[in-house]
UniProtKB/Swiss-Prot annotation:
Part of the 50S ribosomal subunit. Contacts protein L20. One of its GO terms (cellular component) is cytoplasm. InterPro entries: bL21-like, bL21-like_sf, Ribosomal_bL21, Ribosomal_bL21_CS. This protein binds to 23S rRNA in the presence of protein L20. The keyword Coiled coil does not apply. The keyword Aminoacyl-tRNA synthetase does not apply. Belongs to the bacterial ribosomal protein bL21 family. This is Large ribosomal subunit protein bL21. Keywords: Ribonucleoprotein, Ribosomal protein, RNA-binding, rRNA-binding. It comes from the Bacteria. It comes from Photorhabdus laumondii subsp. laumondii (strain DSM 15139 / CIP 105565 / TT01). One of its GO terms (biological process) is translation.
Length: 102
C-alpha cells in the first residue's frame, strides 16, 4: 500500500514504515503529525485518485529529527570589474517516519 500526499508545496510517494525528508515543520521531535492532503491511495489494484484530495484518508507520521541540508553556494562574478559576491544557503528540513495510512 502506498499513497501520494502534498506537504511544503511538494508531492511525496510514501508507504508505511518509510522515512522521508520534508520541508521544515514546526512540530517537536517525537510528536506525531497527520497529513490530510492525500492526492492518491493505492492498495494493490484498488487505486483512489482525489479531485483534488481523497476524502477521509489521512497519513500519520512521527517526527524523527530536524536539521539543515548541505550548503549551497551562490556566486555572482563580474568579469574585468574586480567584483565578486558570494553567499551561502542551508535549507531547514524535518525527517518523518510514516506510521500509518488510514
Amino acid at each position: 500500500m502506498y499513497a501520494v500526499f502534498q506537504s511544503g508545496g511538494k508531492q511525496h510517494r510514501v508507504s508505511e514504515g518509510q522515512t522521508i525528508r520534508l520541508e521544515k515543520l514546526d512540530i517537536a521531535t517525537g510528536e506525531t503529525v497527520e497529513f490530510d492532503q492525500v492526492l492518491m491511495v493505492a492498495n494493490g489494484d484498488d487505486i483512489k485518485i482525489g479531485a483534488p484530495v481523497v476524502e477521509g484518508v489521512k497519513i500519520k507520521a512521527e517526527v524523527v529529527a530536524h536539521g539543515r541540508g548541505e550548503k549551497i553556494k551562490i556566486v555572482k562574478f563580474r568579469r574585468r570589474k574586480h567584483s565578486r559576491k558570494q553567499q551561502g544557503h542551508r535549507q531547514w528540513f524535518t525527517d518523518v517516519k510514516i506510521t500509518g495510512i488510514a
